[in-house]
Amino acid sequence: MQKEPMSQFGYDKLAAELKDLKDNQRPAVVIEIDTARSHGDLKENAEYHAAREKQALIESRIAELSDLLARAQVIDPSSYEHDSVKFGSSVVIIDLDTEKESKYTLVGICEGDLDKGYISIASPIAKAMLGKKEGDDFKVRLPKGESEFEILSINYEPLKF
């Protein structure tokens, strides 16, 4: 079973979504199905079929979240040194072709937010950076082709969700 690294915030966010699905959305869709069923012929009952489809989506998401939470590895990135790129590291890199600098923080798969510079630890660029140190170069295959980067700095900054 592969562990999924995430912050406490990410874990709590997923747990809250799972609780809402189980405690609110699942019972509500059962009522919708019962109401639609009471309207008669199920073959041509669009309301019934829509409610059943919604129920399937809810059950699928419950299963997905339950699995993810069972595999969760809550990590406190403030508890270790960031002398190399790890989960929770904030990394400044430079594209060696364009000389464009970018800053990314490596977070769990459910915590990515590119507007804040938070990228999933499972993303290609994060995978390529893991374990690297300041001054190291790395290559990554992106949709636009292969790019080469240099790590300018690595540090820890508290996550701000």
Swiss-Prot record:
Residues 45-73 form a coiled coil. Gene3D superfamilies: Transcription elongation factor, GreA/GreB, C-terminal domain (3.10.50.30), Transcription elongation factor, GreA/GreB, N-terminal domain (1.10.287.180). Pfam families: GreA_GreB, GreA_GreB_N. GO terms for biological process: DNA-templated transcription elongation; regulation of DNA-templated transcription elongation. Keywords: Coiled coil, DNA-binding, Transcription, Transcription regulation. GO terms for molecular function: DNA binding; RNA polymerase binding. It comes from the Bacteria. PROSITE patterns: GREAB_1, GREAB_2. PANTHER family: TRANSCRIPTION ELONGATION FACTOR GREA. Belongs to the GreA/GreB family. NCBIfam families: greA, PRK00226.1-2, PRK00226.1-4, PRK00226.1-5. Necessary for efficient RNA polymerase transcription elongation past template-encoded arresting sites. The arresting sites in DNA have the property of trapping a certain fraction of elongating RNA polymerases that pass through, resulting in locked ternary complexes. Cleavage of the nascent transcript by cleavage factors such as GreA or GreB allows the resumption of elongation from the new 3'terminus. GreA releases sequences of 2 to 3 nucleotides. This is Transcription elongation factor GreA. It comes from Campylobacter jejuni subsp. jejuni serotype O:23/36 (strain 81-176). The gene is greA.
